[in-house]
């Protein structure tokens, strides 16, 4: 498509006739995601068909008058409901897949970036477009900006990143490749601006990190640090411990070696479970902005050769995550070694090997900055 023709096409988008301020995101209308999801399902054609199916079955039950018949039919109908509920998610993806071009146009027009709030305008406009053109039965297709951003990453960003050299063969409908590439270009440009803003001298505040103590300084050992983290983050551990201690004080027969051994085994399994999954939990607690900030600390922290680089990075990240109220404890990393291992496993390894790991491999937009952080580490 000619460049001038493409720009003219983008300039007159059909969705511009909708005033985004006249539409409201579902997150501001419904009490929760669950109520919105139920509303969407109840207004679907599949659910209404399921309700109509009950009428002949109830009539047949009245004629037969057998109780076991009603039980069998009820169980069967709920199986059908489960199937229709699952199919609704597939139908939603198909609807979005058919409107990839319009979705890309909204991204080009509104230029969203890495912030979730930037995607709310895209969600509002796209919801209105689908409803006004009778492509969706409600005006609440996207729940919020986060769900809209996630759909973009799944429908456009991921296929592009996995098939970068042959994007035309990715799961993108014919005729929409031009809009899709332009939308991705807009998105990457906004992320690049965010990266430069984070790295600017005005944003990188120089906090005093000497007062921030690691586990071996503040708690005596990493074991005590791990125990404290488990108590704070794992509610099951705290609940079980309090419940057993209460029972131990009020019920004398629990004070025997068998019960104590059992409780110790349960508590130990909880600690081991948490310690195994602590890195994954730490990674999932970070959104894209937090990860970008972490990479910025690494890139700027390795500008000069210093044996305490990772310790300073860990302290700054601990302070940042605690101030952002992302981590309940002021200690996210126990020391510099812990911080370095976290970076290598969840950031460096997926990019270097391009492996399909369960976490870390889906943040495709962060790959250039991960490589920049790797380069900074290797230059030391």
Curated annotation (Swiss-Prot):
Keywords: Membrane, Transmembrane, Transmembrane helix
Membrane topology note: Multi-pass membrane protein
Keyword check for ATP-binding: no
InterPro entries in UniProt: DUP/COS
Ranges facing Extracellular side: 92-231, 279-380
Subcellular location: Membrane
Residues in compartment: Cytoplasmic: 1-70, 253-257
Source superkingdom: Eukaryota
GO cellular component, one term: membrane
Record-level GO BP terms: protein transport to vacuole involved in ubiquitin-dependent protein catabolic process via the multivesicular body sorting pathway
Keyword Transmembrane: yes
Principal location: membrane
Membrane-spanning ranges: 71-91, 232-252, 258-278
Family from the record: Belongs to the DUP/COS family.
Official protein name in the record: Protein COS12
Organism, scientific name: Saccharomyces cerevisiae (strain ATCC 204508 / S288c) (Baker's yeast)
Lineage of origin: Eukaryota, Fungi, Dikarya, Ascomycota, Saccharomycotina
Gene it is expressed from: COS12
């Amino acid at each position: 498509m000619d460049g001038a023709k493409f720009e003219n096409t983008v300039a007159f988008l059909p969705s511009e006739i909708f005033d985004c301020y006249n539409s409201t995101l579902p997150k501001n209308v419904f009490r929760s995601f669950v109520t919105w999801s139920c509303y969407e399902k109840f207004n679907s054609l599949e659910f209404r068909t399921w309700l109509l199916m009950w009428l002949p079955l109830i009539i047949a039950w009245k004629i037969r008058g057998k109780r076991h018949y009603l039980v069998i039919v009820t169980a069967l109908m709920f199986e059908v409901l489960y199937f229709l509920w699952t199919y609704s998610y597939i139908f939603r993806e198909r609807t979005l897949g058919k409107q990839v071009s319009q979705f890309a146009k909204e991204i080009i027009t509104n230029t969203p970036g890495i912030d979730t709030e930037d995607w709310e305008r895209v969600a509002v406009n796209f919801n209105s477009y689908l409803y006004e053109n009778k492509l969706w039965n409600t005006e609440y297709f996207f729940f919020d900006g986060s769900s809209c951003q996630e759909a973009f990453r799944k429908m456009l960003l991921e296929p592009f990143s996995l098939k970068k050299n042959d994007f035309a063969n990715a799961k993108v409908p014919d005729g929409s490749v031009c809009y899709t590439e332009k939308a991705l270009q807009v998105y990457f440009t906004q992320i690049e601006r965010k990266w430069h803003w984070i790295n600017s001298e005005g944003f990188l505040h120089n906090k005093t990190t000497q007062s921030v103590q690691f586990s071996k300084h503040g708690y005596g050992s990493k074991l005590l640090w791990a125990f404290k983290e488990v108590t704070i983050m794992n509610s099951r551990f705290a609940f079980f411990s309090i419940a057993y201690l209460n029972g131990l004080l009020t019920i004398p027969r629990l004070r025997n070696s068998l019960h104590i051994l059992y409780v110790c085994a349960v508590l130990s399994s909880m600690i081991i479970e948490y310690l195994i999954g602590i890195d994954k939990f730490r990674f999932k607690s970070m959104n894209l902005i937090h990860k970008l900030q972490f990479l910025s600390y690494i890139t700027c922290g390795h500008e000069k050769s210093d044996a305490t680089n990772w310790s300073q990075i860990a302290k700054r990240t601990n302070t940042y995550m605690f101030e952002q109220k992302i981590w309940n404890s002021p200690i996210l990393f126990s020391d510099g070694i812990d911080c370095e291992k976290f970076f290598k496993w969840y950031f460096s390894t997926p990019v270097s090997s391009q492996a399909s790991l369960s976490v870390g491999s889906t943040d495709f937009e962060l790959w250039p900055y991960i490589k920049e952080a790797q380069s900074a580490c290797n230059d030391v």
